[in-house]
Swiss-Prot record:
It comes from Bacillus subtilis (strain 168). Gene3D superfamilies: HAD superfamily/HAD-like, Putative phosphatase, domain 2. GO terms for cellular component: cytoplasm. This is Beta-phosphoglucomutase. The gene is yvdM. Its EC number is 5.4.2.6.
Length: 226
């Protein structure tokens, strides 16, 4: 294992509530009901895909022009930016600071594969941006998760073969993307979204480098990786 690639939301910090509040505000303005179940469906997908999902849910997929959709996304991001500006290093999820230190101490490269265009700002607010050797810009990709491109791009930026990478996700689309990239998939959470992961932990505090090493060795044996 030469590199570990992280998703951001739900793995490094939890801004799901901020996404929920920002999307709910927009949905209410266009008379579409929006609840937490709907918000769960948006985990791991891009802003454009999220808006399309909301519009389809509300039967309004043909109601807005592209320019109007751009304005809705701009307003959502403005609300979200205001909310994330309050983040501090205290908002790191439990165990993540420790894991980053362990990875650095063993010279294992660290990458970020997040669909969020706000990822660099969030990492700066959390005071961990300097820990990352590569941060993928999702705006440069043709497809988002579950397409593997974002993880393959991270591996290329780190100059590490995908087969030598582990990646950590909390969403079904992300797990699918990791496996399609040919990487060791670590899922944070439980239930249906974690199906397909090579290792599942209930919460980030369970993540340690020792556990990753142990499960990585078992994975190599199962997959006959030299």
């Amino acid at each position: 294992m030469k590199a570990v690639i992280f998703d951001l939301d739900g793995v490094i910090t939890d801004t799901a509530e901020y996404h929920f509040l920002a999307w709910k505000h927009i949905a209410e303005q266009i008379d579409i009901p929006f609840d937490r179940d709907m918000n769960e469906r948006l985990k791991g997908i891009s802003r454009e895909e999220s808006l399309e999902s909301i519009l389809i849910f509300g039967g309004a997929e043909t109601k807005y022009t592209n320019a109007e959709k751009q304005e809705l996304m701009h307003r959502k991001n403005r609300d979200y930016q205001m909310l994330i500006s309050k983040l501090t290093p205290e908002d790191l999820l439990p165990g993540i600071g420790r894991l980053l230190c362990q990875l650095k101490n063993e010279n294992i490269k660290i990458g970020l594969a997040s669909s969020s265009r706000n990822a660099p700002k969030i990492l700066r607010r959390l005071a961990i941006i300097d820990d990352f050797h590569a941060i993928v810009d999702p705006t440069t990709l043709a497809k988002g998760k579950p397409d593997p491109d974002i993880f393959l791009t991270a591996a290329a930026m780190l100059d590490v073969s995908p087969a030598d990478c582990a990646a950590i996700e909390d969403a079904e689309a992300g797990i699918s993307a990791i496996k399609s990239a040919g990487m060791f998939a670590v899922g944070v959470g439980q239930g249906q979204p974690m199906l397909g992961a090579d290792l599942v932990v209930r919460q980030t505090s369970d993540l340690t480098l020792e556990l990753l090493h142990e499960e990585w060795e078992q994975y190599r044996i199962r997959e006959s990786i030299p």
